Amino acid sequence: MVKESSAFVRKLAHNDPATRKAAYDSLTNYLQSPAGTRLRFLDLEKLWKGLYFSMWYCDKPVPQQNLAGNLGELFSKVIPQEKLADFHRAFWAVFMREWHLIDKWRLDKYLMLVRRVLRHNFFRLCENGWKEQEVAEFVAVLEEYPLMNNMKFPQSLTYHICDIYLDELEYVVFKEFRDYSEESEDSEESADSGSDDDSDSDSEDENPRKADENGGKTEGKPQKLSEEEISEKKATIIAQTPVKALVAPFEKVAETLKNKALREKCKEELLDDKRLQTWAVVDGEESESE
C-alpha cells in the first residue's frame, strides 16, 4: 500500500522520467492485479493519501504536469469499472481533508490535478459511450463531495470545479476539432515553463490524425471542414452526450445550496454559460429570466 512517507511516493514525483515511469508502471500493475481489485474504500483512501503526497513532493513544472496526467489516467485507463466510483470518492475524501493545508506555492499544481481528474473521468465516460449507469455514478460522487449541501467541503475547490467543468467537458467531446499543432497550455499552467506533458499524452491517445482506421499513418493534411460542417458534427456529438444529466447536480446546487455566494457562482460560471444555450441544453430566454 502506498503511504505518504514511502520511497515509492517520492519516485512518482521524481525529476528523472525513467524513475517516474517505473513507479507509475508499478502502481498501475498493482491496481489491475487481483489484490488491487479487492481494495476497499478505506484502502483507496490510504492510496490517495499517498498519491496526494506524491504531488506535494513534485517540485518542477514538467514533472508536475506529467504526474497530474498520470494520476488522471488512473481514472480513464487503469481502475476497473467496478472500483471507479469508490476510487473517485476516495480522491475527493482526501482532498476535502487536506485542502486547507495546501500553501499558496503548491496550490496551482493541485488545481491542475483536479482538472486532470475531471478530464479523465469525462474521457472514461465518453469512451464507454456515456452509459446511463456510469454517468449516474459519476454525478452521484460529485453530489456526495464537491457539490454537497453543507460547508464541510472546501468552497474554493467547489468554485474551481464550477469554473472548469464545461471547459473540460468541451475538451473531451470535441477532441477531434482541437488543433494539436497549436494547442495551448491550460490557464492554471501558463505561468510554468516547459511543455504540457499531459496535453501531449492526451493528444497521442485521442488525436484522430495519428493513424487511420487500419492503424497506419495518415498521408497528407486532413481535409479541412467548413464552419457549417463543423457545426453540424458538433451538434451530432452533443446530441449523443448527456449534457443535461451532467449539468443537473449544478442546477440543484443553484437552487438549494445554503451558501448564497456559491449558488450565484454556480449560476454565473456554469448554468448561464452561453455554450449550454448553443448546445440546446437550456433555453436562452429561460436562462435570462432566471
Predicted regions and their residues:
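Short sequence/structural elements of tandem HEAT/ARM alpha-solenoid repeats
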Residues: M1-K3, A22, L39-L47, E82-A90, ...
